[in-house]
Design a protein with these regions (language model features):
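Alpha-helical segment proximal to the catalytic Tyr-Lys
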Residues: 10-11, 77
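C-terminal helical subdomain
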Residues: 21, 43-79, 84-88, 112-113
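Residue-level signal for well-ordered alpha-helical positions
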Residues: 7, 34-35, 82
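Conserved active-site helix of classical SDR/Rossmann-fold NAD(P)-dependent CH-OH oxidoreductases
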Residues: 1-6, 10, 17, 65-66, ...
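A short hydrophobic alpha-helix cap/turn motif
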Residues: 12-14, 27, 59, 72
Length: 113
């Protein structure tokens, strides 16, 4: 999808058509809550998910909507061929050694018997 957006941006740029995309990360959507409700311990699963996020929280979908609104605004007229990642920093890199997950040794990443 990213390369398609870039190619379309090149193809249509001279016509003043901008092509961008948004790549969302974990969000507080209905699907997220269905997944949580199906868990044995929803509170623990949510805490684990939030702990994995560099910002420490699962994001509200409104943040994606706000990003799209900005990209549509005149203030973003110079943006084209861009992928804006709204994931709370998850894809920027993450140190899993500092995350407590049941059955995993945080120092080595290996499972415990």
């Amino acid at each position: 999808m990213r390369q398609l957006a870039r190619t379309a941006a090149l193809d249509y740029g001279r016509d003043r058509i901008r092509v961008n995309m948004v790549s969302p990360g974990p969000m507080l959507t209905d699907l997220f809550f269905i997944h949580m409700d199906a868990a044995e311990d929803p509170a623990a699963l949510r805490a684990t998910r939030e702990n994995r996020q560099p910002l420490g929280e699962i994001l509200d979908p409104q943040l994606v909507a706000n990003t799209v609104l900005f990209m549509l605004a005149d203030e973003a007229a110079g943006m084209t061929g861009t992928d804006v990642v709204v994931d709370g920093g998850l894809t920027a890199g993450f140190d899993y050694r500092n995350v407590s997950m049941p059955g995993v040794d945080g120092r080595t990443g290996s499972g415990s018997a």
